[in-house]
Structure formats: structure tokens, C-alpha cells
Design a protein with these regions (language model features):
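Residue-level signature of catalytic and energy-coupling elements of molecular machines
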Residues: 38, 136, 171, 204, ...
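Alpha-helical scaffold segments in soluble metabolic enzymes
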Residues: 73, 131-135, 156, 203, ...
Length: 306
């Protein structure tokens, strides 16, 4: 019912979600879990910068209702410009009060005439959010909050000290690769590349083997670079077009294919990451792709971030 992160059948997804929550409740000794938190992501998710400006004529308090209005305006701006997308989340980036920039939201005692609010907007196809909602309608569960994946990973992985000093998260997913850089209360940089581990497997498939075998070879024997191959083993893989035929795949050939796609995906992200190296103290690598043999070493060779 879910294929590479895409919901194909909402009714089946609803049943599976309900069953997973039942098993989880049993595991943690709860009678029932009534609330759920979900993360949203995928190839359709994009990042956009948006801002709103207000002239209060004279210096006076920047009240919360004004900030709420500015946030709502930013959301409307994006959805008016791109009717096919929905704003999945709107995260404050920074504020400008009378020409002075600050990371934190204005405090009750701050006064300003000219107020700017800058946001990072996570947007995706409208059906992305709707399919999640439809799936949960078929379960007696309530979605308490939907997080975009970069924000959820930030809360899950980074400590308060990391947030204060600055941190980066590289999420190596199946269909997308996302780099997020965060410091204080501000996203310094966020970019989603619509390629991931699935694209690596499709490249390996071009050797004349099936996609499931390509995925298995990548996960069990693949390396992030040819230099990391210690023994150039050869793997006999069944050929889909011949009942008794097989394809011989060398470990170095496998690594070369993987490395080529990784370079295409990661080179621009690593270049951008290095521009922020002096502003962050730690880089987290997560997602299924992070488990590829030699991935940590591969990343370390391309960046000066710890």
C-alpha cells in the first residue's frame, strides 16, 4: 500500500497505521494511543523564502497579533503564486526591526516602526498532505501535529548546545537528499535534492539485473567510493531476461556506479555546506543512505565540519 514513500491505497495504509500503533502501545504498555505525530517529505517538497513587511508609522510595540498576520500573509503569498502547492510548514528565519536584524522573535518590550518577518516555507503538492489526512481518517487516531522532515530530524538529533553553536543535518533518503543548516533560532540554509538511494539502485539496475537485486547489492556489498573496496569480489546475480543466465558484477564496478551518483547528488550540497563551516560545530548524517559502507568517510573527505 506504500511504495517508495508513495501511498497507493489509503484504506490499506489506514489499516496498517492502526495496526502499527496497536503494536507500539503494547510495547510501551499503554492501553491505547489516541494521538499521532507525522512527518511530511518527498520529491515534491521544496523550500522557499518569503517575507512580510509592516509600517506601524511610529515606534510602538510589535504585538503578537501583528506577527500572526504577517505569517498568514506569507502563507497566502506562496499559495497564491503556486496554486498547485500547499504550505506544509512556515518556519521563522529572522526579523528586521527598523533596519536592525535579529534571530529571535520580537519580545513584548521591543518597539519599532518598520517590521520585517522572514520565513522559510516548506511546500509540497496539495495531495501529499491530503493523502496523509485521508489515511488517518480511516483510523480512530488524531493527528496532533504534522512536522516537515527536516524540522523533525532537527528536534530528534540536535541538542540544545548543537542548536546554539550551529549544526547541519544531511538526510540521505530514498527519493530525496536534504541538507539543513541551523543556528540559534534560525535556518541558515535548507535545500532538497530530488534524488536519493532509489536513484543509486536504478543506476545499478542498468548492469542488467533486477531492481531488488540491485538494492541488495548496494546495501550488502556497495561502497561509497572505489578506493574503499578492499577485495574486488565478483558477484553472480541472476539475469531477469534469462531463466538460467547470470550477470557478473565486480565490487569495484559497483562502487564506481554508486560513487558517480553520490557525486552528482552531494557535490553541490557539500560545496554549500563548506561555506557555513565556520558557523556550525557538528554535522549529523541520517537516513537509509547513511548506512552505506564508507559513507561517513566519504562525507568527511568533502567537508571540514566535524
Amino acid at each position: 500500500c506504500v511504495e517508495r514513500g508513495v501511498s497507493r491505497n489509503q484504506s490499506n495504509v489506514g489499516f496498517v497505521v492502526g495496526e502499527v500503533m496497536r503494536l507500539l502501545a503494547n510495547r510501551i504498555h499503554y492501553d491505547v494511543l489516541t494521538k499521532t505525530f507525522v512527518t511530511l517529505g518527498g520529491r515534491s517538497m521544496k523550500i522557499a523564502s518569503v517575507m512580510s513587511k509592516r509600517d506601524q508609522v511610529r515606534r510602538k510595540e510589535v504585538q503578537q497579533h501583528l506577527l500572526d498576520e504577517m505569517e498568514a500573509e506569507c502563507k497566502q503569498k506562496i499559495e497564491a503564486q503556486y496554486p498547485q502547492v500547499a504550505v506544509l510548514d512556515l518556519v521563522p528565519s529572522y526579523y528586521v526591526l527598523d533596519g536592525k536584524e535579529q534571530d529571535e522573535a520580537p519580545s513584548p518590550d521591543q518597539r519599532a516602526a518598520l517590521v520585517e518577518a522572514h520565513y522559510v516555507a516548506f511546500v509540497g503538492k496539495k495531495e501529499l498532505e491530503q493523502k496523509v489526512v485521508d489515511s488517518f481518517i480511516r483510523t480512530p487516531k488524531h493527528i496532533e501535529h504534522a512536522y516537515v522532515r527536516p524540522e523533525a530530524l532537527l528536534y530528534a538529533l540536535a541538542s540544545e548546545e548543537d542548536l546554539r553553536k550551529g549544526c547541519a543535518i544531511l538526510d540521505l533518503g530514498a527519493q530525496t537528499t536534504t541538507l539543513s543548516i541551523f543556528k540559534g533560532n534560525q535556518y541558515l540554509y535548507t535545500k532538497v535534492v530530488s534524488q536519493g538511494g532509489y536513484d543509486v539502485s536504478r543506476d545499478i539496475e542498468q548492469l542488467g539485473i533486477s531492481l531488488p537485486y540491485a538494492e541488495r547489492l548496494k546495501c550488502q556489498y556497495g561502497c561509497a567510493s572505489v578506493e574503499q573496496v578492499r577485495v574486488n569480489n565478483a558477484f553472480r546475480v541472476p539475469e531477469p531476461s534469462a531463466a538460467e543466465g547470470y550477470v557478473l558484477v565486480k565490487a569495484t564496478d559497483l562502487a564506481a556506479i554508486i560513487s558517480s551518483r553520490l557525486e552528482q547528488i552531494l557535490s553541490p550540497l557539500m560545496s554549500d555546506l563548506n561555506q557555513y563551516a565556520d558557523r556550525i560545530s557538528v554535522l549529523y548524517i541520517t537516513g537509509g543512505g547513511s548506512m552505506l559502507n564508507g559513507m561517513e568517510e566519504y562525507i568527511q573527505q568533502q567537508t571540514t565540519v566535524p
